[in-house]
Amino acid sequence: MADKLVAGKHLRYILNLMAEKKKESFESVVMDHLRMNGAYWGLTTLALLDKLGSVSEDEVVSWVMTCQHESGGFAGNTGHDPHVLYTLSAVQILALFDKLNILDVEKVSNYIAGLQNEDGSFSGDIWGEVDTRFSYIAICCLSILKCLDKINVKKAVDYIVSCKNLDGGFGCSPGAESHAGQIFCCVGALAITGNLHRVDKDLLGWWLCERQDYESGGLNGRPEKLPDVCYSWWVLSSLIMIDRVHWIEKAKLVKFILDSQDMDNGGISDRPSYTVDIFHTYFGVAGLSLLEYPGVKTIDPAYALPVHVINRILFTK
């Protein structure tokens, strides 16, 4: 059992993983199409640990820009198709390095705005899949770029609210099951647009705090599922945004995250004794940030970027 965050080993794990991306390792091959997301997870973890300077800014930024398409959207890697998922990660990475100025903001924002549907929802790409994840991504990305006026915000918000369920949660579409990941997306989008008053905070807060497993202290994403470190982000961030985070046992959740670390080689897994990956490493450290763990920089619960980065963007003309 772990009693502290082994930040130095997580740093080494992430840097080794990034070095492997240049080789034909198994993990680099299976994650090739979503490398942009992996880069965001790894780099944001480094930023939260105050170690972003450990990577080559020029190398990362140059690679990110090779993933942009003529449409303005970004792909998960060079040679792949653009999607809003990867576009947000690309924008977030550039924000980390204070390089948003190299973007053709008009082009990127037009790409995102062009994916809004008549009912206010958003498609993820030209193939038309609709999901509240994409609503959050569009709103978050356009807010960072200061281009929310490019879309019909009222319709976007009304669509998100139409995905609210009787249990207070939100699903991926109207009538779909409540899920912590979708709840983060919907609550995050409502927070960014100033519409949190449309959330039943007590009802949703109860549903979210019920996600904590009594024995392990970990959180799950929906009823009758195993606890998973990634929900330390999805559930906690939502609770913070609706001011109900005091409804869970924070100390038990901290222990669950710390116990999910690989104490020898670094990295964090979905639960204790499982295999680590960059996805859970990021969400574990981000969860500790939300829990105000010592030595971890503060992350914004709506934008999923360090608070100092968001302050620099939103309070700079």
Swiss-Prot record:
<feature type="repeat" description="PFTB 2">
    <location>
        <begin position="57"/>
        <end position="98"/>
    </location>
</feature>
<feature type="binding site">
    <location>
        <begin position="222"/>
        <end position="225"/>
    </location>
    <ligand>
        <name>geranylgeranyl diphosphate</name>
    </ligand>
</feature>
<dbReference type="GO" id="GO:0048364">
    <property type="term" value="P:root development"/>
</dbReference>
<dbReference type="GO" id="GO:0009555">
    <property type="term" value="P:pollen development"/>
</dbReference>
<dbReference type="InterPro" id="IPR008930">
    <property type="entry name" value="Terpenoid_cyclase/PrenylTrfase"/>
</dbReference>
<keyword id="KW-0637">Prenyltransferase</keyword>
<feature type="binding site">
    <location>
        <position position="230"/>
    </location>
    <ligand>
        <name>Zn(2+)</name>
    </ligand>
</feature>
<comment type="function">
    <text>Required for male fertility and root tip growth.</text>
</comment>
<keyword id="KW-0862">Zinc</keyword>
<dbReference type="InterPro" id="IPR001330">
    <property type="entry name" value="Prenyltrans"/>
</dbReference>
<dbReference type="GO" id="GO:0004663">
    <property type="term" value="F:Rab geranylgeranyltransferase activity"/>
</dbReference>
<feature type="repeat" description="PFTB 3">
    <location>
        <begin position="105"/>
        <end position="146"/>
    </location>
</feature>
<dbReference type="InterPro" id="IPR026873">
    <property type="entry name" value="Ptb1"/>
</dbReference>
<keyword id="KW-0479">Metal-binding</keyword>
<comment type="similarity">
    <text>Belongs to the protein prenyltransferase subunit beta family.</text>
</comment>
<dbReference type="InterPro" id="IPR045089">
    <property type="entry name" value="PGGT1B-like"/>
</dbReference>
<feature type="binding site">
    <location>
        <begin position="179"/>
        <end position="181"/>
    </location>
    <ligand>
        <name>geranylgeranyl diphosphate</name>
    </ligand>
</feature>
<comment type="function">
    <text>Catalyzes the transfer of a geranylgeranyl moiety from geranylgeranyl diphosphate to both cysteines of Rab proteins with the C-terminal sequence -CCXX, CXXX, -XCCX and -XCXC, such as RABA1A, RABA2A, RABF2A and RABG2. In vitro, can prenylate PGGTI targets with the C-terminal sequence Cys-aliphatic-aliphatic-X (CaaX) with leucine in the terminal position. Substrates with the C-terminal sequence -CSIL such as ARAC11/ROP1 or GG2/AGG2 are prenylated independently of REP and when the beta subunit is associated with the alpha subunit RGTA1.</text>
</comment>
<comment type="subunit">
    <text>Heterotrimer composed of the alpha subunit RGTA, the beta subunit RGTB and REP; within this trimer, RGTA and RGTB form the catalytic component, while REP mediates peptide substrate binding.</text>
</comment>
<keyword id="KW-0808">Transferase</keyword>
<feature type="repeat" description="PFTB 4">
    <location>
        <begin position="153"/>
        <end position="194"/>
    </location>
</feature>
<feature type="repeat" description="PFTB 6">
    <location>
        <begin position="250"/>
        <end position="292"/>
    </location>
</feature>
<protein>
    <recommendedName>
        <fullName>Geranylgeranyl transferase type-2 subunit beta 2</fullName>
        <ecNumber>2.5.1.60</ecNumber>
    </recommendedName>
</protein>
<feature type="binding site">
    <location>
        <position position="280"/>
    </location>
    <ligand>
        <name>Zn(2+)</name>
    </ligand>
</feature>
<dbReference type="GO" id="GO:0046872">
    <property type="term" value="F:metal ion binding"/>
</dbReference>
<feature type="binding site">
    <location>
        <position position="228"/>
    </location>
    <ligand>
        <name>Zn(2+)</name>
    </ligand>
</feature>
<dbReference type="GO" id="GO:0018344">
    <property type="term" value="P:protein geranylgeranylation"/>
</dbReference>
<feature type="binding site">
    <location>
        <begin position="231"/>
        <end position="234"/>
    </location>
    <ligand>
        <name>geranylgeranyl diphosphate</name>
    </ligand>
</feature>
<dbReference type="Pfam" id="PF00432">
    <property type="entry name" value="Prenyltrans"/>
</dbReference>
<feature type="repeat" description="PFTB 1">
    <location>
        <begin position="7"/>
        <end position="50"/>
    </location>
</feature>
<keyword id="KW-0677">Repeat</keyword>
<dbReference type="GO" id="GO:0005968">
    <property type="term" value="C:Rab-protein geranylgeranyltransferase complex"/>
</dbReference>
<feature type="repeat" description="PFTB 5">
    <location>
        <begin position="201"/>
        <end position="243"/>
    </location>
</feature>
